[in-house]
Amino acid sequence: MDPNTVSSFQVDCFLWHVRKQVADQELGDAPFLDRLRRDQKSLRGRGSTLGLNIETATRVGKQIVERILKEESDEALKMTMASAPASRYLTDMTIEEMSRDWFMLMPKQKVAGPLCIRMDQAIMDKNIILKANFSVIFDRLETLILLRAFTEEGAIVGEISPLPSLPGHTNEDVKNAIGVLIGGLEWSDNTVRVSKTLQRFAWRSSSENGRPPLTPKQKRKMARTIRSEVRRNKMAD
């Protein structure tokens, strides 16, 4: 096992422990608490994958952090903080919308890289909007916390979430997952659009209605479908 993978996990465990203490003292805001819950699931998944005990890893992580802080001067810390890019946390969903349980009549689940896509195939002929909570850096999506699909009535009918056992994903991973979710929902004659915030940061070349542009493969498939419909209509005439 790569020692850097182990030490990274150990430090992450200790830093999560510190953030948990902050939350216990009621010093964290909603985005802080949201990330804390998500990171807890991620650490459990990583610990299981690596075969490492979280409590033991936390103690070792504390030693690593203490050693670094002891060796680092205040001036070096100031320079690091000044040069580090700042990320922003953007929220389409409320805490209630993010934490609400939902159920599927005809569940479908697909794993796309480090992301899990879930949708209810029983939903038909609905107007659906995709909302997400995520962080942004350099005007691009940095980390997806959670994406959900809502009907006009507020029912949850789809979701994209990071896999706890596979931390880390790219902007391209998110775009691909959104395309899969949209395609699955539209298969049942639903009309899907994307929130303005997600449209702005997840991709730059969306159409005006919040839809990503069709890929060449999708365009060819649509052309074949149209030709097939035309032939059937001619035969019917």
UniProtKB/Swiss-Prot annotation:
It is found in: Host nucleus; Host cytoplasm. Its main location: host cell. Residues 204-237 are annotated as: Disordered. Keywords: Eukaryotic host gene expression shutoff by virus, Host cytoplasm, Host gene expression shutoff by virus, Host mRNA suppression by virus, Host nucleus, Host-virus interaction, Inhibition of host innate immune response by virus, Inhibition of host interferon signaling pathway by virus, Inhibition of host PKR by virus, Inhibition of host pre-mRNA processing by virus, Inhibition of host RIG-I by virus, Inhibition of host RLR pathway by virus, Interferon antiviral system evasion, RNA-binding, Ubl conjugation, Viral immunoevasion. Residues 180-215 are annotated as: CPSF4-binding. The keyword Ubl conjugation applies. Residues 226-237 have a biased composition (Basic and acidic residues). The keyword RNA-binding applies. Residues 223-230 are annotated as: PABPN1-binding. GO terms for cellular component: host cell cytoplasm; host cell nucleus. Upon interferon induction, ISGylated via host HERC5; this results in the impairment of NS1 interaction with RNA targets due to its inability to form homodimers and to interact with host EIF2AK2/PKR. Residues 1-73 are annotated as: RNA-binding and homodimerization. GO terms for molecular function: protein serine/threonine kinase inhibitor activity; RNA binding. The dsRNA-binding region is required for suppression of RNA silencing. Inhibits post-transcriptional processing of cellular pre-mRNA, by binding and inhibiting two cellular proteins that are required for the 3'-end processing of cellular pre-mRNAs: the 30 kDa cleavage and polyadenylation specificity factor/CPSF4 and the poly(A)-binding protein 2/PABPN1. In turn, unprocessed 3' end pre-mRNAs accumulate in the host nucleus and are no longer exported to the cytoplasm. Cellular protein synthesis is thereby shut off very early after virus infection. Belongs to the influenza A viruses NS1 family. This is Non-structural protein 1. It comes from Influenza A virus (strain A/Fort Warren/1/1950 H1N1).
